[in-house]
């Protein structure tokens, strides 16, 4: 059967593209970048989004997004927009205190592991470029993302969820504190307190937002199974044309 081109799917990819451009422009302006730097960040964003769009299409064709080849990327758009909003909020936070571990956790709830990895690193790249961060904060951000990627799959194990939430809190506090010590060569207790607040927010998102988004993703599967039984469903019409017996 032929590939179905769905207008809503194209619109949602376009909106994801606009969100990426928007967060890059906002971050660049808040970081007081020069015009040439803004243009450079815009070019990087366009390059990333072209690759991200192809990855979306590839993951959809493999039925990796909600086990649904006919997904319209609506859940991906919501997760991407939420991640962009969080990235803008992180711009106001002091160094070493941005709870970026929340990004892969949220994106994996609405999409796939691959999409979570790519989008999270994109948002962190925009964040660090806008803040003009030094190498230790970039490494701190990277370590938090890696921790988020590793913990994401564990959250599906509801029986041991409390232990994973404790682990998330500990990691989200210790990594910023350690990297800030490497940079300043002395302890900063204000960073400890702010990192603890960020860790608590990450825990809350893992405990409540992650399962909520996961249930929405599962509901998309149920809606898909209902839709394919309808007479006006596109692929069902194609099957009817192709083989009356199979229909």
Label each PLM-derived region with a short phrase.
Residues 2-17, 72-76:
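N-terminal membrane topogenic signal
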Residues 12-25, 78-84, 141-148, 164-180:
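Hydrophobic membrane-spanning alpha-helices of multi-pass integral membrane proteins
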Residues 120-122, 166-247:
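Acidic/His-rich, divalent-metal-binding segments that scaffold phosphate/diphosphate chemistry
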Residues 124-152:
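Interfacial aromatic-anchored transmembrane helix boundaries in multi-pass membrane proteins
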